[in-house]
Amino acid sequence: MTQPSLNPLVIKLGGAALSCSQTLSQLFGAIASYQQKEQRQIVIVHGGGYLVDELMEKLQLPTVKKNGLRVTPYDQIPLIAGALAGTANKLLQGQAMADGLNAIGLSLADGGLCQVEELDPELGAVGKATPGDSRLLQTILNAGALPIISSIGLTAQGQLMNVNADQAAVAVAGALDAQLVLLSDVSGVLDGKGHLIKSLNQQEADALIAGKVITDGMIVKVQAALEAANDLGRAIEVATWRYPENLEKLFAGESIGTQFLPA
């Protein structure tokens, strides 16, 4: 049985993993194998930007981003909610079920898990999530199921909102008092010699950015991870799904990527 000291684990799943059934099968297979031996509770939070991009292209609708966040016109949110809370969520649920897991598909709104408000009028139907009531989610976890949660939420007035998946994962982890791992294409942050940096704070990250060690798209990932650690008030981890043999170590509380430290 799991040590009582291990809090639930929230895994934010992103990057190319969402579009690769083999990668997903390796991830869910590792979760199934781990949970046969240990009882740590695991939650998946996902986005699905690639599905939205494909949908927008098919419908010949422009994709506009502001400061890295997708602008979501209110007349498009039903389509985007369908892609994320519908297609992406059910594809993940289906793969998890095929790999032997009792998976349940949810959104941020279910059971009042997260409270969502409009983030910025210029972004349209884009929401900011804050931790809400985790009782329904905890009941599902206690039943031995794997919740798979999309980053679609509802305001108190019932308005659909698209929430950045990293930020959604922070809110879910906050509601559950859980450890958070952002699982993506990258193994973490590398130093100038290509070695994995085990932990990073804002001051160290600023120095690496100034020294051109952290560049381009990685700057956005690093700043988002540090912001997530600050929001959650505890260290979070960025790790990769590329090495399934390492995933069970991650589930057991061992660091396999870069730990981002709150200020």
Curated annotation (Swiss-Prot):
Keywords tagged on the record? Amino-acid biosynthesis, Arginine biosynthesis, ATP-binding, Cytoplasm, Kinase, Nucleotide-binding, Transferase
Q: Which CDD domains match?
A: AAK_NAGK-NC
Marked site, Transition state stabilizer, at: K12, K221
Pathway field of the UniProt record reads:
Amino-acid biosynthesis; L-arginine biosynthesis; N(2)-acetyl-L-ornithine from L-glutamate: step 2/4
Q: Which HAMAP family match?
A: ArgB
Question: What is the documented function of this protein?
Answer: Catalyzes the ATP-dependent phosphorylation of N-acetyl-L-glutamate.
This chain belongs to the protein called Acetylglutamate kinase
UniProt organism field: Vibrio vulnificus (strain YJ016)
